[in-house]
Structures are given as structure tokens and as C-alpha cells.
Amino acid sequence: MELIIISGRSGAGKSVALRALEDIGYYCVDNLPIDLLPQLADILSQSQASAAISLDIRNLPNSSQHLDEILTELENKHQIKIIFLDADRSTLIRRYSDSRRLHPLSVQNQDLSLEAAIDAEQIQLDPLIQHANLIIDTAVLSTHELAERLREFLRGNSDKELKIVVESFGFKYGLPLDADYVFDVRFLPNPHWNPSLRPMTGLEQPVIDFLSKYEDVANFIYTTRNYIETWLPMLERNNRSYLTIAIGCTGGKHRSVYIAQQLGEYFQDKGKHVKIQHKSLEKHKNR
């Protein structure tokens, strides 16, 4: 039986993910104690071809060794995939503020603040993250986009085409959680120090003109795209659904935006399925 285990940080979207899997034909069980998982999987395998089960922090064992033993037992009998949903700390805090719900660890310990509960959960979930086949950063995904990402990972599409995401980000806001490759461009010339360019972004022509005149910038783009092109065929043969390439500068406004755009457009011109996104630009718009 195909068994999908959905887990992740509280507030990252496990319930949404489980509903999405139910919509594409998985038999779904929400929030099962992990000690019951092998027995339930054996029962379901008699009548179901595929099932999805969500696990949250309250139902995981205290021992990482015990977790390893349970997952090994399942892998010996079933086709297991573990999907871990994640989001950055500020996104989780905002979601809890919007929903006005308590974090599961705050329910167990009312003296625990939301921030402390989020941090404690991250530590406790670390052993499970090590087993994940897919980690999805839900901070920038709509409900529909999360459902589509899950569908493509599990069901694929007719041509099995690798989807490439090239994204810019600012290191001051933290590393992207879903990146396969991270390139740091903070050593390149910075338009921020030019007062006329500071309010602009790497998508605007004056900034493009500023960066494109530097040989170091051109060399970085050239060597980075060559590196990706060298290994892309092997990544495509590895039956991956997504490849996420993250380009980071200090604020995610100038250098990383320009270079991510250049790389993304290059691979689009090569006929690859590429999505370009600029994760930190929205933060600058809201200032």
C-alpha cells in the first residue's frame, strides 16, 4: 500500500494538505498516535491502495530511536513517503494570531508562550524532518498552490517534467525552507549604496544597467547557470518533481532579484518549466 505521512509544524497547513489528498483519492486519517500507525496500515492495506495519515507534535514519540523503529517497520511492508510542512516563525505567529487558536504545546503547558511553543516544537520535530521525502514551505503558498504541489509530487504529470523554481530572498529575513540550492550574492556590488537606486528593485532598468556593467556579476551568472546545467540532466532522471534554486542578498531587493530573474529567464528560454518568484519584495512593498 502507498502510505503518505503528513507532518510538520503546527499552523503550517497539515489539515489543508490532508483535505487535498482526500480530494485526489487517498483514504485519510487525521492525527493518529504514531504507535498505532503500523497496525492501522496493516488493516488499511487489506482494502485501500493508498492512504494518508497526519501526525502532529502531540503524537510523536519522545525517542528518535523509537521513531526510527516504527518508520523502518512501515517501510518493510508499505511504500512510505513522508511530507513535512514548514513555515517561518513570523508566518506561524501571524496565522495563530489570525485564527486565535492555541498552539498544541501551549494547550499542554499554559505557561508556554506562542513563540516559545513554536521554538520548542521545531526542536522536537527535528528527528522527523530527517526522514522527510519532501519539505514544503507553505509561507508563500495559497491553499490551491499547496494542493497542486502535493498532487504533482504524488501523482506527477503526463510528461514527468521537472519544475524549476528560481527565487530571490533576503538573508535578513532568513533562509528559504524549501530550497535545494542556495547561492549567496552578498559579495557582489550593491545598488543599495547608490541613493538614486536604493528605492528601486532588481527588476527596474536602472538597477539592471548598474549590475550588468560589472564583470563579476556576469561571471557569477555564467558559472552558476553552467553548474545548474551540468547537473540538471541527473536531477531530471532522479524522478524529482521540483528543483528550487534560491539566490540571496542582504535584503532581497536588488542583487538577488536581478540574478534570479536572469537565471530564470535563461532556463525558460531553454524550454524548461520555470517559475520565478521574489520572496522578499513583498516585505519591501509593505514598508
Swiss-Prot record:
Nucleotide-binding listed as a keyword: yes
Pfam families given in the database record: PapZ_C (PF22740), RapZ-like_N (PF03668)
Residues bound to GTP: D56, I57, R58, N59
Listed Gene3D superfamilies: P-loop containing nucleotide triphosphate hydrolases
Keyword annotations: ATP-binding, GTP-binding, Nucleotide-binding
Binding-site residues for ATP, renumbered to this chain: G8, R9, S10, G11, A12, G13, K14, S15
InterPro entries: P-loop_NTPase, RapZ-like, RapZ-like_N, RapZ_C
GO MF annotation list: ATP binding; GTP binding
Protein family membership: Belongs to the RapZ-like family.
Function: Displays ATPase and GTPase activities.
PANTHER family assigned: RNASE ADAPTER PROTEIN RAPZ (PTHR30448:SF0)
Stored HAMAP family: RapZ_like
The name this protein goes by in its record: Nucleotide-binding protein Asuc_0930
Species this protein is from: Actinobacillus succinogenes (strain ATCC 55618 / DSM 22257 / CCUG 43843 / 130Z)
Lineage, highest ranks first: Bacteria, Pseudomonadati, Pseudomonadota, Gammaproteobacteria, Pasteurellales
